């Protein structure tokens, strides 16, 4: 992908979905921007004020909205198609362990770059990449897509704790070499069943010291829930291959306590009963609906999420547990999986929780069409609706890809 032009631009759109807290939709307005949004006004006024120095972009029949944020993916598994087994979390996990080295070797530059292009074509301007091996570092750093790069740490065998920590530090320090506003190193603690408490504590202390974002998988399966609650189930048989006498490192509550006052994305959480255990100021839930359907046969209880006032966001997860990294495919899947939701209301919520709400949590000054925000946005082909309340829904239903994508005000060439 290449970036085109640094010049100020005036973009005219038929409808502008601002994705602000009221889900305001503007009609027949212009957005003036360079790398940030300078003004939103009538097109004639924009041309009169800025026309001599600005490039005119005429999308008078189309829709403009903020670029999506996909905060949880695994690009290192981009080679998977039918290698991994779905339908049962433990079967899937065993197939991952058996195949991960082969799949990571097959995830060459071209495979990862292809999936990044798919993400961008579906309107994604920012990703949260969970990196287990570090083979994706330079690819993400040079991809043109904004990347929060979660260096992953795990390890349950007490004989290899120091080795696990040193390997993590080596990968993290390497990723720091690429740090800028488009590539942000961060930390992922894999999960409570795979990460010894001493490693989780070290990772959390490291994050506090260096002001880093964190991510973790949490209560993705019934197996994990039973393991943390009591410790005696099929999960123990699985864990015997990593430790002679495996025992739970945590209870669900004690695991969460390690992330106190740390901005953390807790991914999945489909077997969480009480969301009040999270801190709404520092914690958010990442929802991967397709992945949960394939592996856990359960989905997130959105009513419990809303009642707790905790932020939630939408992610595709990786091709290890999904058939597509196209973000619009994931949004459509949510409409079907959460079949008790009002379609139009839920569509608006999905768009907000994939843009402005996630940006606020991640500390990114974007995700909303408003003055001063970073100019990350997408153009969608126009269509007619008789009711404005249908716009969000029809954007999700009618589009496989965006027409154009701008990241930091620069046009992305697909």
Regions found by a protein language model. Give the residues of each.
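Active-site core of metal-dependent hydrolases
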Residues: 182-313, 320
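Divalent metal-coordination and catalytic microenvironments
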Residues: 14, 31, 35, 61, ...
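Active-site gating loops and adjacent loop-to-helix segments of metal-dependent hydrolytic enzymes
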Residues: 79-110, 148-154, 221-262, 334-344
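C-terminal cap of metal-dependent C-N hydrolases
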Residues: 374-414
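Alpha-helical scaffold segments that flank or form the walls of functional sites
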Residues: 32, 63-64, 81-145, 166-180
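His/Asp/Glu-enriched, well-ordered alpha-helical/loop segment
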Residues: 300-383
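N-terminal metal-binding scaffold of metallo-dependent hydrolase/deaminase domains
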Residues: 1-50, 360, 364, 410
């Amino acid at each position: 992908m290449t970036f085109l032009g640094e010049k100020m631009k005036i973009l005219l759109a038929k409808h502008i979905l601002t994705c602000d807290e009221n889900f305001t939709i503007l009609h027949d307005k212009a957005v003036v921007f360079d790398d940030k949004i300078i003004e939103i006004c009538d097109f004639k006024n924009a041309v009169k004020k800025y026309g001599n120095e600005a490039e005119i972009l005429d999308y008078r029949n189309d829709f403009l909205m903020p670029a999506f944020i996909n905060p949880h993916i695994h690009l290192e598994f981009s080679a998977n198609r039918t290698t991994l087994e779905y339908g049962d979390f433990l079967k899937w996990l065993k197939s991952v362990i058996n195949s991960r080295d082969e799949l990571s070797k097959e995830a060459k530059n071209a495979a990862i770059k292809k999936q990044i292009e798919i993400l961008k074509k579906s309107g994604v301007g920012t990703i949260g990449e969970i990196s287990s091996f570090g083979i994706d570092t330079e690819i993400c750093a040079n991809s043109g897509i904004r990347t929060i790069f979660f260096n992953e740490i795990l390890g349950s065998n007490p004989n290899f704790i120091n080795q696990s920590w040193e390997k993590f530090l080596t990968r993290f320090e390497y990723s720091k070499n690429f740090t800028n506003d488009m590539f942000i190193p961060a930390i992922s603690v894999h999960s409570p069943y795979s990460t010894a408490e001493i490693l989780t504590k070290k990772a959390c202390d490291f994050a506090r010291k260096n002001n880093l974002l964190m991510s973790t998988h949490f209560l993705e399966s019934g197996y994990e829930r039973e393991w943390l609650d009591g410790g005696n189930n099929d999960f123990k048989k699985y864990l015997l291959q990593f430790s002679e006498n495996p025992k739970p490192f945590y209870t669900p509550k004690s695991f969460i306590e390690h992330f106190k006052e740390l901005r953390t994305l807790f991914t999945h959480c489909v077997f969480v009963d009480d969301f009040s255990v999270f801190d709404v100021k520092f914690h958010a839930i990442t929802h991967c609906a397709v992945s949960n359907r394939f592996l856990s046969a359960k989905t997130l209880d959105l009513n419990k999420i809303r009642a707790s006032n905790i932020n939630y966001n939408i992610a595709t997860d990786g091709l290890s547990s999904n058939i597509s990294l196209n973000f619009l495919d994931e949004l459509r899947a949510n409409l079907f999986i959460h079949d008790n939701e009002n379609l139009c209301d839920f569509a608006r919520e999905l768009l907000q929780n994939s843009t402005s709400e996630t940006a606020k949590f991640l500390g990114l000054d974007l995700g909303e069409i408003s003055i001063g925000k970073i100019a990350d946005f997408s153009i969608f082909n126009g269509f007619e609706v008789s009711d404005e309340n249908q716009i969000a829904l029809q954007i999700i239903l009618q589009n496989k890809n965006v027409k154009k994508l701008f990241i930091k005000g620069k046009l992305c060439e697909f």
